[in-house]
Structure formats: C-alpha cells, structure tokens
Amino acid sequence: MTLCAVVMTALLSQAQVTTSPNPLQEDSQNVVIFFHADQGNKGLANLPASTAVYAHTGVNVVDASGTEAAWKYAPKWLDNAEKYRLEYVEPNVWKLTIGDIRTYYGVAAGETVKRLCFVFRTADGKKEGKGTGGADIFVDVLDSGFQLSLSNGLTAPVAAVNSSITFTAATTQAATITLTVNGKQEASKQNVTELKVPYTFAAAGEYKVECKAVAGGNTQTQAMTVLAVSSATAATDKTIPPLGLTRNADGSYTFCMAAPQKQSCVVIGSWNDYQASSAGVCEYVDRMIDGQPFRYFKTTIPAGVIKGAFSYYYCVDLTYNVGDPYARLVLDPYNDKYISASVYPGLPEYPQGKVPNNTFLAYHSDTMLDYDWQCKSFTAPDKENLVIYEMLLRDFTGTEGKAEGNGTVNKAYDRLGYLKDLGINAIELLPINEFNGNISWGYNPNFYMAVDKAYGTPADYKRFIDRCHELGIAVILDVVFNQADGCHPWYQLYEPGKNPFFNLNAPHAYSVLNDWNQAYPLVGEQWRDMLQFWLKEYKVDGFRFDLVKGLGNNDSYANSGSAATEAFNQSRIDRMKQLHAYVSEVNPDAYFINENLAGAQEENEMAKDGELNWMNLNNAGCQFAMGYQSDSNLNSMNAKDAGRTPGTTVAYLESHDEERLAYKQDQWGVAGVKGNHAVSMQRLGSAAAQMILMPGSHMIWQFSEMGNAQTTKSSNGGNNTDPKTVSWNLLGDPDNNGLMQSYRQLIKIRLAPENKELFSTTIQPFGNSLSGWAQGRTIKTTAADRELYCVINPNVTGAITVPVSFRLTGNDDYWVASKSYGSEPAFDVAAGTVTVPANSYVVVTTRNISGVKDIPAADAAAWTVSVADGSLRVAGLTAPAYIYSMSGSQAGVLKGDGEVNVPQGIYVVRSAGRSVKVMVK
C-alpha cells in the first residue's frame, strides 16, 4: 500500500517530536512522546527545567464509515491537568508519558486512531511550541500488526537541489527492508527494524522513493515523491497576474502568490493527489513599491493537467505550507466536518493525511460562483435615510428556544418577509468571509475573499442578497481590517518579528489577534481587491469597517496606550479615504461606514469624504430604558447635536458590542421598571422613537425590536460570543409583539417617501429635545403642510401633558400615527397639548403623513383578502401574493387568485407593493 500523505505528516513531526516506540501503533504500550523545543517554531526553546509545560493534545480518528475527524478528544484549551504536563529531560527536550493510546485519550470503540495531534504550551498559553510557521504537530499511528513507516525529515514534499536528507524506514518487527529512488536500489538490509538511507538530490526534478519490507511472508510497501527544486528563476514575462487563481481563455490556470523575501514557491494540488510536480514550480517577478522590494511567484498549469474542480496550497521556501490568501473557498481540516450536508450540499471533503500540517486548502470550481441574478437593477436607499438591521446569521435563525448557533443564510432568507414588513431598508451582516471555526461572530478572519461555509454556499449568499434587493433592502458587509487569525497564509509564511505583513506588537491599544501592518503596500492591495471583489461578485451595497482606530500607520500612535489611540490621527483619515476610493471605483454610491467612535474632528474629516460614522448611544439608551435620568440624553441621535456633520452618523441604541437594554432593565431597572414586563417594553419603544424619528441613519441590533433580554456580556464585562438562544417566540407575548409593532410603525413613518423632507438633515434647527425628564421629551418637524410631533414621557409613574404648537385648528386635522402598545395618549389641538401616560410615547401628525394601520380586506383596492375556516383567500391579483406569519416565515405563495390553508394566527399578505394584515381564527 502507498501512504504518501501519511508519510509527509510523519516527516514534519519527526525532528520536533520523536516517540518510543517508533513507529507508533494503536496497540503500542508504554508510549512516550519526546518534544524537542528547539525545533519548529521554537516558541518554547530554552525554557528552564522549572517551567510548567503542557500538551494540548487530541487524535485524528476514522469511524466505521471511513470518515476521518481531526483533533478529537482534546481537552479545553489551557486544561492543566497533570496528565498533560511534560517532564523535563534535558535542555530543550521534554517528554509526555501516554502509556496506552486509546486509554489516554478515551477513544470510543469503533474508531481507529490515525494520528496524535499536539500543541505544546506554557501553563498560561502565552507561549506555544508548534511546527514551522505555527502549524500543529502530528504523529502518525499505524494499524496493529506488521507495519512499515517511511519518513525523510522534510516539512513538505519538496527539497533543495544538492541538499542531503535521510530516508528512514521503520518496521514494527524485524524484516528485510529495501529502498529505491526512481527505480534504483539505494539500500537493503535483512533482519532489521530500521533502515536509514542518506540521499543527495543532484538535479531538479521529481524523485519517486519506494520502500518494501518483508517479514514472515508479509509484505508492506510505502512510497513518496519528493520534488527537488532550485531557487526560483526570474520570469522572462514581467507581467504580474492578479493575485490568486486565474482561469485563462485556453483553459489553463495561472497561480500568483505574493511572498516578499522568499526564494521559492511550488503550488501543489489535488490534480495529482497532492504530489509535488515540476509543473507547480513558480517563477518570480520583482517590483519596487515606494522604494520597497516585492516579489511575486507565478506559474501556469496547462488545461490538460488541471481542470474543472480542484484544491491546492503553496509550499514556500521548502518549509512553509500555506493556503491561498485570495482563495474564493477554503477547505478547513478542523471544522468542515461539522458542517452538515443540509447547510452545504456537496462540500468537498478535506483530504486528511495527504497534506502536511493540516494546511488550509484553496478550493476552486469553474462553476462554484455561478448564479442567475433575478434582480437586474437595484437602487440602494439614500445613505442619510438608512434604517439598518444588524444581523448575525448564526443566531438570527436556528433551533427555536435553543442556543445551538445553527442559523444559516437560507434560514435568514426565509425570514426576509418579516424584515420587509418591519420596514428596514438595509441589513448589515456580521462578517461572513472565512473565519476560524464555525461558531463565531466572524471577527477572527483568515481568508477575506471566501465565504464562510458554516452559513451556506456561495449561491446561498447570492440568493439572499438578490432577494434583499428585490425587496428594496440593501446589504452591507461588516469587514475586519485591523486583525487576522493565525490561519491567514501571510501570517503563517514568516517567523514572528520578521513578517512584513503583520506587526509583532500592535501599535494601538485595542488589538486582540494578529495586527496588520496597515502601511505595507501589499496589505493595502489586499483590502482593495477584497472590497472590489465583494462589490462585483456578490453585489453587496457597502461595508462597515470594524475598529477603525486600529487602522492607523504604525508611527501614527505616540504609544500603544488608550490615550494615544483615541487621539486625532491623520493617517486613519487618509487610510479610510483610500479605501473609500477603492470602493468608489466600482460603486460611487456604495455605503462606507466606520466604527471609529473617535473625536468629532477626525470623524468630520471622514464625513467630508462621504463616509458615515457609527454613533454609540447605548449607555444613554440603557439609562433611559432603566428609568434613570442621569446620562440619558439622546439628543446625539441627531448628528448635529453630537458635533458631527448632519446626516453622517449611524446612531444606535444597541449593537453586537453593547449590552441589551432589556437585560439592563431586568437587572438594574428602577422600581416600577425592573420586574414589570409591560412597562419595560413600553420604555424600549419610547427609546426607539427617540432614535428612529431623528434625522440621519440608524441601526437596530437583531431582536432589539422584540425586546430581547439575553445578555451579550461575560462576567468580566467582555463580549460573550457564545451562541444565543433563538427567541422568535417572543412575538407570541403581547408586550413584546407590541414593541415590534411600535418599531414597525416608527420605521414606516421615518422611511415613507412622502415623509422624506420631514427628516431632512438640512432642516435647521430640527426640533428635538431629548434630554429632559419630568416635563417630557419632544421631537418636532414640519415640511410644507406636514407636521409631526413626538412626545415621550420618561417618568415611571404619572401622565404628563406637554404643550405643542399645532399649526392647524381642529382635532380632525391630526391623528395618532404611532403610540406605545397598551397606552392611551390624547391630544387637544385647541388647547395645544398632548397627554402621554408614563413610560410611553405618542406620534401625532397631520393626516397627510403616512403611518401603519391594519388594512381591512375591503380597503385593499386592486385585490382583496378573505378568511374562512382556517384558510386565507386572495382575489383580484395582478402579481404574485406572498403570505407571511408574524414571525417572518413564508406561509404560502399565490401566483393567481386562490387560497392557502394556514393555522390560526396573524398573517401579512403582500402583493404589488401593498400589504394587508389579517387574522385567521
């Protein structure tokens, strides 16, 4: 049998980890692992004997179906149980006593162990001993009985011309072992358990190494191919192709990898079962950018060798095995196995055992990005009039009542009817490009141009965006440019402190992962290419940029303290202008939203460039919601009252980073709020009115409109990124549903086209007074013959009557366009007053201002709805009718007159731009 890939993984670990016995088998006894800390990444080199060193260890197993799973039975990170502690042997040598493999790891019956997996670390995890480039360490485990292993000490199936290595063959019992290279016998010995064969690669090319062991009539064989390469040669064609993979007109494929300071690069792929070949050897092109040298490696593989669908990786400098930073899809050896076929049908299986270091693979299919767009033309809403719904796909849908993190983009698609009825006109998706793991917020990116498969396929994402556009909803992507996960290829390609792409230490105060060197030209090129790719390929409508404070040049921060990070920073302004220019090259009207949360001077400079800036009013919103007057001023919902250029902020009460208002009400609300659910929901609606009815764009964090009260924080105050309970059943509670209806009404008023001038950012002054308490708060805006007055009663007890200067004379000239659920406000035009119960709000407008009311079937104009015996009938249709439950699920579609059987409940019927809400009993 030939186990080339198993051999390669054994080779990687041999110098860094040795074993007794060698080779290992499932039934080996008294197993001891020896860790050589001065090999690999040398992260634990030269530690004193007194240091507590631990192994984070698991196993790769194959189950009865033949499926291989990686890193099973590993403990939680930083488990310092005694069984994982290593014993000091001598300088840079430590040992871990395992004994019986299956017992040590607790391997289940029916599973076969294929590899041991290791990351060595200090007790606090701040130092790690890993493979070269930060790779995990793997040791092969052979089946029981007579077995043969073959290794060579290389970190990849590539070696340098004129280099000498030693091939080591080991058997589990005495045997005759013979080794040949390209058909020529190099050595043979009888009655041995090990054969070492030194070998020098005299010329470039492919070397097929074969080994045979014979014992007692049993024969085992192993084989591997080693590609010997010289340092790369300069390409005669100095053209630099697009980074990543390009399919050419003749069916060939060109690969291009940027790797400054490197000497060689070989692309290795599935087209020949991950054997390195001469066709994958790259040439290089050098160029200078701003006086700095840069190197690009490229090769073109003919159509006859490679076609259709394949996966690949790069071996750089014979040492570093990395994926493609520009991959459009990634195969993950650790997490793909947890993605079900219902989420990603036909997901290619990671080739366990065939790729060194469990390297992430780039996957390409000529058709994987194909999609037939249905919405051929979409006009995005004006950037000053956005009501954005911030969505984490993971938790937006999934198993109701459970926190399983199994939401998907297709399940979100099925809820778009709910969001359309809610009235929002933009969705901001938390990061959806490939991030580490499947359960995440996505702020740990590793491949910026690949969708994360945990939520669905590329076509699923496109279908979601397409449908949003059909519904008039823009789609904004949250992107993370300040940091990357350790799986990013450019992070793995260099040793710490020698990486031009990443800073060894972040220059700013808010770093979490690996900090990008923003001024490095190739980093900027990556951002340009990434932004333009998503605009063109997925037709997104803009971006929200995470932690803009971390996007300054290294020398722009006086130090890494918070004060220096918060200070005005011209380089951040310049960088965001450059990124905006990249976006504008594709779509001049694309949204460009900064999470900067900096001073007015810096943000107003960004605003001059047409950028929007987040405005965080969570603290004030929480104070108001809980019933505290102090620090509850919400006037900054209007940009001009925050010292910002009018119309240039996205102001919000909640975001993924902030605590839920409802949670704080439950925990710390004043008497009369805490423990009073109806009052709490009314106050949340009153807070929403102070946000939505102010000029400029605003944002709703998912389920704020339902009064979701799940905490988003850990006990230490940091973000809790664990899955949250899916709680669509909140809409079954009258008070929560009433809050949602308040949001719906307010958004309808805010975004109705005929009301646009009421909320124009050019109105000076806009009549908002949102800092008072005892005497109430008010919003007043007029335009031509339209008037809108919103009165909010912050008091926990007692109604208030507030003077209002109505311009018309009769009560019949006005109506209540929106009010808190369960409240009974009143207005008297002659007296010039509005009376509002405690905790509540009311919006009084002239009757020519659109609001939201239940539309009786008789008033449905071109088509009518009737209900009888559990069915819902629609007549007079001129366009398809879509029926949605109040939870947003699609209950049916009628392409012509007809009926749909539905359970009892409230439904929205939508057709030809008109919506009708009916109750089925």
Label each PLM-derived region with a short phrase:
Residues 830-850, 907-912:
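C-terminal beta-strand-rich structural cap/linker in extracellular carbohydrate-active enzymes
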Residues 539, 562, 566, 573-713, ...:
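Conserved alpha/beta catalytic core and glycan-binding cleft of carbohydrate-active enzymes
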